[in-house]
Amino acid sequence: MSLPFLGPMSLSGFEHSWFFLFLLVVAGLAALYILMQLARHGRMLRFANMELLESVAPKRPSTWRHLPAILLVASLVLFTIAMAGPTNDVRIPRNRAVVMLVIDVSQSMRATDVAPNRMAAAQEAAKQFADELTPGINLGLIAYAGTATVLVSPTTNREATKNALDKLQFADRTATGEGIFTALQVQAIATVGAVIAGDKPPPARIVLFSDGKETMPTNPDNPKGAFTAARTAKDQGVPISTISFGTPYGFVEINDQRQPVPVDDETLKKVAQLSGGNAYNARSLQELKSVYATLQQQIGYETIKGDASVGWVRLGALVLRLAADALLINRRLPT
């Protein structure tokens, strides 16, 4: 948690927990203070004239005289917590990563169940996704139908991706597996480059956008099928986030014949599961933008352990200052 004027504070993830041994010293000081107060009270009773003591001493000794000591002990406890090095989870933008956006451009994307049609809605949402993705992410674009084509290799140039999205063209058939395998080949090149440079390979993810069932091959477990490609992605450590877009009532006109093109959620859900990714579905442009916003948060940021001791230091300093002020005020109060 983070408190106003204090900063981040946490009671977990301690990096130097052995500092808590200092609390034994703090406890010893507190015990010593109590013993000194008891001894002082005993001396007063032993040597004072009781009649005179009762006439000049207050009926109830002020408890304020103990406040400076209590605050001092509290500040030492707070400083001890700070020295133990508490940490908390901090979300920061990724400096580097590779995301391949793989979009289905088959004829079913002409369906108008999502206005103005599935393709136009997909283009608008994908461009917004590109704009909002954190700058350190390398974004690439692949369009697929019967074959897959790399339109934009991974780059931080968002304009290149958006320009390519505007030029998407419809094509026949749906080879989802081909789209995934093509994305994995692009990522393999990026990974090899990072390893040669002596660095760890950047995290990678495929975002697969489609509305229909794979038609080439018809069996997704075929060596070139979507399920086989998803298993390969998992083996390479590249999760696939799938987005199934459209409604069960979509249709297209082909040769003056109305052909139903219902959205296929189940196939894409299994692709995500097999790859270790997540599956999403959207029935409208607004829902699609919401899905992309969720992905942007997942992909664009990473969670690291951050220092959470600053708040404890500031609070300890504040309590220590109060202890000093209480000591000054205490001199003016009856004891």
From Swiss-Prot:
Coiled coil: none annotated. The keyword Signal does not apply. GO terms for cellular component: plasma membrane. SUPFAM superfamilies: vWA-like. Residues 98-295 form the VWFA domain. InterPro entries: UPF0353, UPF0353/GerABKA_families, VWF_A, vWFA_dom_sf. Keywords: Cell membrane, Membrane, Transmembrane, Transmembrane helix. The keyword Cell inner membrane does not apply. The chain crosses the membrane at residues 18-38, 67-87, 309-329. It holds the Pfam family VWA_2. It is found in: Cell membrane. It is a multi-pass membrane protein. Belongs to the UPF0353 family. PANTHER family: LEUCINE ZIPPER PROTEIN 4, SPORE GERMINATION PROTEIN. HAMAP family: UPF0353 (MF_01340). This is UPF0353 protein MAV335. It comes from Mycobacterium avium. The lineage of its organism: Bacteria, Bacillati, Actinomycetota, Actinomycetes, Mycobacteriales.
